């Protein structure tokens, strides 16, 4: 990867990540370009000191790591997620209708529903194809508009602008053109197979707009899927800048799936991907249980997921004492109910690394009367007991079909994560860090 961070590289990743499967494939391609070797989970792994590897699970989650060059003493690790709120196609075969080609969908995650209306949409995901030897996955994404979700005109709904409660089953079903059209046939052509060879599929709707700079000076940008592909790409970039100068430290980067629906899947943060890979790496190194616990204690894991910037039209929705400014730096996310993993201990360490790197940090906290959401860190903590810090970048219109964020913040995140992967971290005793700043 280019040693200079480029916002265009982030845009390419956002444009490529039209589904969790495509996000994972895009990350895998970047890793392979940088010398990382694929290790299928079902294969026996032959891992070498200092080696660079990655594995995928379900084709929608991916984990990469650099092996330590000497006896294991600790880890660097950053986690993000590959999925975004969207609409899942229930089945490929269009429903019978005399006028339109229809394929029913259901909501995935907590999207802003009306943001999907009246815009050109495509589909993306994977089809499972029957072959002579079994079943094969193939990514599909027609590079054109194939669907839309039409609004009910104002003449039939005079109260539309006074607030409407959308019923996903009734108001938000897409059309795929005129009656007689076949979504299965379109995807079969994309996959290079016959329609009858598609056994099953995982398909979602996706926006057609490309990532684009916004603002009189181009300081912001708009795109679909900023949450959380912005953090995924910037942490991956930072991970790839790690020089591996500490012989006993291993470096990890992971992008989970299904965060938007609770992470409770095999490929989600509540699954065992992270723990399984670490265990296999430690076993290859001959690490004892005690050595494993000590190494995981000498770790600061970054859970990276975006947060809400203070809205220009509704500043009252944010904590008045902690306004979040787009372009103001990385968010250090805190929550008294432990929805975020940041503590004074872990926040101090990350803040010190950012200060040394010249990266500004903003404290993110919800209003006391707003419960707020959660993210990867506290769920991943059910599997891996490492010190963690929740970070992110401020954005507007989270979970809309199109979101807005800051170009400067993306650069800040990339710079901070690169500094993190090149900073020795050691916990000599509980409540004390030694940082190689």
How would you describe each model-predicted region?
Residues 1-437:
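N-terminal hydrophobic/helix-forming segments and targeting peptides
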């Amino acid at each position: 990867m280019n040693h200079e961070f480029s916002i265009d590289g982030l845009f390419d990743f956002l444009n490529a990540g039209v589904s969790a499967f495509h996000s994972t494939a895009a990350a895998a391609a970047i890793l392979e370009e940088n010398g990382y070797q694929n290790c299928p989970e079902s294969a026996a792994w032959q891992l070498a000191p200092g080696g660079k590897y990655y594995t995928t699970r379900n084709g929608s989650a991916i984990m990469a790591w650099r092996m330590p060059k000497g006896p294991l003493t600790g880890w660097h690790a950053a986690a993000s997620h590959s999925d975004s709120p969207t609409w899942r196609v229930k089945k490929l075969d269009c429903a019978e209708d005399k006028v339109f080609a229809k394929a029913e969908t259901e909501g995935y995650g907590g999207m802003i529903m009306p943001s999907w209306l009246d815009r050109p949409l495509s589909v993306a995901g994977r089809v499972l194809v029957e072959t002579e030897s079994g079943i094969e996955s193939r990514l599909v994404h027609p590079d054109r508009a194939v669907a839309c979700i039409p609004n009910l005109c104002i003449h039939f709904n005079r109260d539309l602008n006074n607030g409407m409660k959308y019923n996903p089953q009734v108001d938000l079903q897409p059309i795929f053109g005129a009656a007689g059209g076949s979504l299965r046939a379109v995807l079969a052509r994309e996959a290079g197979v016959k329609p009858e060879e598609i056994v099953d599929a995982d398909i979602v709707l996706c926006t057609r707009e490309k990532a684009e700079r916004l603002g009189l000076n181009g300081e912001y940008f708009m795109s679909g899927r900023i949450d959380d592909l912005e953090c995924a790409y910037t942490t991956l970039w930072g991970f790839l800048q790690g020089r591996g100068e500490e012989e006993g430290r291993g470096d990890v980067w992971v992008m989970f799936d299904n965060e938007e629906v609770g992470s409770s899947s095999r490929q989600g943060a509540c699954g065992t991907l992270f723990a399984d890979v670490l265990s296999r790496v430690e076993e290859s190194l001959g690490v004892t249980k005690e050595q494993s616990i000590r190494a995981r204690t000498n770790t600061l894991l970054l859970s990276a997921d975006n947060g809400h910037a203070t809205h220009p039209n509704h500043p009252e929705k944010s904590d008045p004492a902690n306004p979040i400014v787009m372009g103001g730096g990385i968010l250090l996310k805190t929550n008294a109910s432990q929805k975020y993993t940041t503590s004074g201990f872990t926040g101090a360490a990350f803040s010190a690394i950012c200060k040394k790197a010249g990266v500004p940090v903003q404290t993110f906290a919800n209003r006391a009367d707003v419960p707020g959401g959660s993210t990867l860190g506290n769920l991943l903590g059910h599997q891996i007991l490492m010190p963690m810090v929740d970070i992110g970048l401020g954005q507007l219109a989270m979970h809309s079909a199109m979101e807005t964020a800051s170009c400067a913040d993306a650069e800040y995140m990339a710079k901070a994560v690169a500094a993190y992967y090149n900073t020795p971290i050691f916990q000599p005793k509980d409540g004390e860090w030694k940082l190689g700043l």
